[in-house]
Amino acid sequence: MKKSLFFFAVSLIFAISTVTGAFAKDIIPVRPNLSQVTTIGMYQVCDDVTIYKEPDENSQILYRVRWTNDEFFPSEIGFENFFVVFLPKKNLAMVSVTDFNDDWVEIMYDNSTGATGWIKKDDPYKFMTWINFYNTYGKKYGLTLLKSSPEECNSIKSAPEETAQTISTINHPKKINLNVIRGNWALVSVLDMDRTPKTGYVRWRSDDGVRYFFPMLKECP
């Protein structure tokens, strides 16, 4: 009997630890997200956020979101629908922004539906436009080409325009360094598996706002 209780307790502890680990997994874009094309940037959120219908503390409260590294409330939204980037070991917890004013940001709080609401800024420097976000993290850690991106995203152009000459292609990149962003084009230096350096322009974002490349945040300390 005692032996049975012991094995039951061990099994229960193992099950709990397994579930907890599943909740705490890292979140980072791996494919282009069509629901986020209207977003204008990112905001680093704290672990207790009140979401309002309007940028006014007297307006309707839509949700109060709270999270730890292992749990998220409310569960009907969850980690993956709320965050664009969630890397707790690197202190990164970012949501996408659709609008802002001096004191508030409108965030997309459910990436699966595109639902939005307003949160009050607790620090004005936590908001970054997409250009600032890429200049900060993309230049420092490089870029990765998201899965399922159009084939033409592998084309390296001589100038930041569709009709420019294709001077090379991205095949099996070891590193994609971001040099500068010009509109929806990025000047990059690519080191492929054959160790051949390639420099030119790639289409990092469509005219509709779909992002094909994303900073290599896994590389940040």
Where are these regions (language model features)?
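Intrinsically disordered, low-complexity segments enriched in Gly and acidic/Ser/Thr residues
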Residues: 139-197
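Bacterial N-terminal signal peptides that target proteins for export
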Residues: 1-9
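Bacterial N-terminal signal peptides
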Residues: 8-18
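Residue-level detector of intrinsically disordered/flexible regions characterized by low predicted structural confidence
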Residues: 4-5, 176-181, 220
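Boundary regions of SH3-family modules and the immediately adjacent low-complexity/disordered segments
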Residues: 25-147, 165, 189-221
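Sec/Tat signal peptide C-region and signal peptidase I cleavage site
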Residues: 19-24
